[in-house]
Design a protein with these regions (language model features):
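Helix-loop junctions on the cytosolic side of multi-pass membrane transporters
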Residues: 109, 157-187, 200, 406-414
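Transmembrane alpha-helix termini and helix-breaking/packing motifs in multi-pass membrane transporters
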Residues: 22, 134-157, 251-253, 370-393
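Helix-breaking motifs and short loop linkers at transmembrane-helix boundaries and internal kinks
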Residues: 24, 56, 77-82, 306-310
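Juxtamembrane intracellular "pre-TM" segments in multi-pass secondary transporters
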Residues: 171-231
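C-terminal transmembrane bundle of multi-pass solute transporters/carriers
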Residues: 31-33, 42-50, 57-61, 253-414
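Cytoplasmic helix-loop-helix junction between adjacent transmembrane helices
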Residues: 88-131
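A single, central transmembrane helix in multi-pass transporters
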Residues: 13, 19, 218-273
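Hydrophobic core of transmembrane alpha-helices in multi-pass small-molecule transporters
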Residues: 5, 71, 82-98, 234, ...
Length: 414
């Protein structure tokens, strides 16, 4: 929990959209920066997952922290489009190395202790700790900005990211959770892959990497429960790319800059609540999840519309934005909770040894959806407001709800 929490205790998280805007970036340019970030993750998602099934997962998490630290340092030292873009490439690479790696490491550690059934609850608490850290970071961002501007916010973020890297080195290691049958299957496929080495030598780590990549992607495509689980988790987490526009919605509504982090904080409290409740909702049926996600779509759409009504109404701006962001926060919490449950069900459905690779396939598809969100945002905001954009994205949650009953993997037997 400490590792994930410190990784989210970054003051820049509350202000980077405004940082870009205050340095002359248009909404289209900001969306392009987000797309660069997502595209980097997209290109590296599955290969990094296969790497995590081959080499030290703890080492990859430490490397991820180093890249994250470098990215924030670049943003602070070179606040321009080029600097922001390069920082996002580093951050995207960092995220790809960590995506699936931490979850697989956690699951394997619990499996080694005979407590794999606790995975949904532990993962929920871990993410709740991370969301709580975001709340603290949001609260800290305002005084840091008032005292030292974006420079102090940026360098504070660099220091915290460095501490996150050091914590990664203290994480436990555990044997990968593989059954005897899976080991035999892996050895057979590895033998076929390595056989040609009598003619052309190939480094063993690379052969293992290819084997894990093939095994993980193959399971994600071939096994129905895994395939649907991958798709559902990707949809639920990919659609949350809309959170990158919350600060811009608040700014468009007409509130003061000092209030923007507080409104964004309402949405973070929503996701925090969703994380905490994941242990209680882990056994929900697909039908129940569909109803919850459908309700979240209605709340999100309504909240975006209400916040949009605040524009040009200084007498009611804080009332309308408070109600609007409160509704969005509740919706965000429901969607976030559903994403955690779907991710836990996916982990239970995975039977092969390439757990991190399969998880990364879901992450890859999530990045594809995020890219679609960013592209959609860049186009929509050419003609319509930010509130209209978010209302349309809220409507898409309703479509996800319709798919949930069929795609949610069954709960593992107790």
């Amino acid at each position: 929990m400490l590792f994930k929490s410190i990784g989210e205790l970054i003051p820049l998280y509350a202000l980077y959209a405004l940082l870009f805007a205050d340095h002359g970036m248009s909404t289209g340019q900001i969306s392009l920066l987000f797309a660069i970030w997502s595209a980097t993750s997209f290109l590296l998602e599955v290969p990094s997952g296969a790497w995590a099934d081959t080499v030290s997962r703890r080492g990859l998490l430490a490397l991820s922290g180093v890249l994250l630290t470098a990215g924030f340092a670049l943003w602070t030292a070179v606040p321009s489009f080029a600097g922001f873009a390069a920082g996002f490439v580093l951050w995207g690479t960092s995220g790809s190395l960590a995506s699936g790696t931490f979850e697989a490491l956690l699951y394997d550690d619990l499996a080694a202790r005979g407590e794999s059934g606790s995975y949904p609850r532990v993962l929920g608490y871990t993410r709740a700790g991370a969301e709580a850290a975001v709340v603290v970071a949001i609260v800290a961002a305002t005084p840091l900005y008032l005292y030292g501007g974006y420079a102090l916010v940026g360098w504070s973020s660099v220091v915290i990211a460095g501490a996150h890297t050091l914590v990664a080195l203290s994480l436990p290691t555990a044997p990968k959770a593989v059954s005897a049958v899976d080991v035999d299957d892996l050895e057979d496929s590895a033998s076929e892959a390595i056989a040609p080495e009598s003619v052309v030598a190939r480094p063993r780590p690379f052969a293992r990497y290819l084997t894990m990549l093939k095994t993980g992607v193959g399971e994600a495509i071939r096994v129905r429960a895994v395939r649907y689980g991958v798709l559902l988790e990707a949809l639920l987490f990919g659609i949350t790319a809309f959170d990158e526009y919350f600060a811009l919605l608040a700014e468009e509504s007409g509130v003061s800059t000092a209030v923007v982090p507080l409104l964004v904080g309402l949405t973070v409290l929503g996701s925090l609540t969703g994380s905490v409740l994941a242990g209680r909702t882990e056994g929900m049926s697909g039908r129940t999840m569909a109803i919850a996600v459908g309700g979240a779509g209605v709340l999100f759409l309504g909240g975006a519309v209400i916040a949009g009504l605040a524009t040009g109404r200084p007498d009611a701006v804080y009332l309308l934005t408070g109600v609007g962001f409160g509704s969005i926060g509740v919706s965000y919490g429901i969607v976030y909770n559903a994403g955690i449950v779907a991710g836990a069900r996916l982990q239970d459905a995975i039977e092969g040894p390439a757990r991190a690779t399969v998880t990364s396939v879901s992450g890859l598809l999530g990045e594809v959806i995020a890219l679609a969100v960013f592209g959609f945002a860049a186009l929509v905001t050419l003609w319509w407001s930010m509130s209209t954009l978010l209302a349309l994205l809220g409507a898409s949650i309703l479509a996800i709800a319709a798919l949930t009953p069929r795609w949610l993997p069954r709960s593992a037997e107790p």
